Amino acid sequence: MDKIFVDEAVNELQTIQDMLRWSVSRFSAANIWYGHGTDNPWDEAVQLVLPSLYLPLDIPEDMRTARLTSSEKHRIVERVIRRVNERIPVAYLTNKAWFCGHEFYVDERVLVPRSPIGELINNKFAGLISKQPQHILDMCTGSGCIAIACAYAFPDAEVDAVDISPDALAVAEQNIEEHGLIHNVIPIRSDLFRDLPKVQYDLIVTNPPYVDAEDMSDLPNEYRHEPELGLASGTDGLKLTRRILGNAADYLADDGVLICEVGNSMVHLMEQYPDVPFTWLEFDNGGDGVFMLTKEQLIAAREHFAIYKD
């Protein structure tokens, strides 16, 4: 962005509303990619401008006319420039993201939270589980957002938050502490189930890496700032999912269920395993590629995934 253009913004824009409008204009003109918690330039601007001012997203309407200091304007303009020129997701610029109505710390060690599984958590998995879960596993926890949201939804449950990445677990631990859930959510480093004791979970929720090789090569630049370890999963996007399917039954209680997100790779899963009775879940707020299997169904399908058992 031209320096004269930037100086003009700092000198002439005065209020929060001015900065919101200017940010929307810049985002719209730059044709940036939305997909890290927002789907339009207005929401993108709100999530950049207000956290940059250490304000909540739901400030009163009349507060938007508040005037800004020069340093505040410079901070916002700098972040807008980086969002446009470097295609950095807003969450990495502000170190804030939201999931299930809760705020989380994020940086480039973890993916930005955006899973449709959040809708299931908000609905307490209604119609999917037969009882209140006492022991929940969040596999591939990343920032810990799913594990923490589950702990809020089921305050009497113990939640294990598993990831192979020590960097991701450091972020998850920070979020667990900030939410005051150190006695409810337990971070565990493990290569999927490989280093876990044989615990029986009532519910296993997982959003593993599932982007196939073709989609990885075509991802917008915004996704290049996210850890590849959290995205890529082999040629067809199912490298980790097969291992999960090969092992999950051993870690589920008799009436337990597995809920797994595979995104666009659902096509490959259905093509390769037509005999497996995946229940594909529907969402009111958008999203797809999430299936459910019961322990009984996983046991019945074992022959398909036996070679992937740890």
Curated annotation (Swiss-Prot):
Cellular component GO terms held in the UniProt record: cytosol
InterPro entries for this protein: DNA_methylase_N6_adenine_CS, HemK-like, Ribosome_uL3_MTase, SAM-dependent_MTases_sf, Small_mtfrase_dom
CDD domains reported in the protein's UniProt record: AdoMet_MTases
Claim: S-adenosyl-L-methionine is one of the keywords in the record: yes
Enzyme Commission identifier(s): 2.1.1.298
Keywords from the UniProt entry: Methyltransferase, S-adenosyl-L-methionine, Transferase
Keyword Zinc: no
Single GO biological process annotation from the record: protein methylation
Listed SUPFAM superfamilies: S-adenosyl-L-methionine-dependent methyltransferases (SSF53335)
HAMAP family per the UniProt record, alphabetical: L3_methyltr_PrmB (MF_02125)
Family (UniProt): Belongs to the protein N5-glutamine methyltransferase family. PrmB subfamily.
Function: Specifically methylates ribosomal protein uL3 on 'Gln-150'. Does not methylate the translation termination release factors RF1 or RF2.
Name recorded for this polypeptide: Ribosomal protein uL3 glutamine methyltransferase
Organism from which the protein derives: Escherichia coli (strain K12)
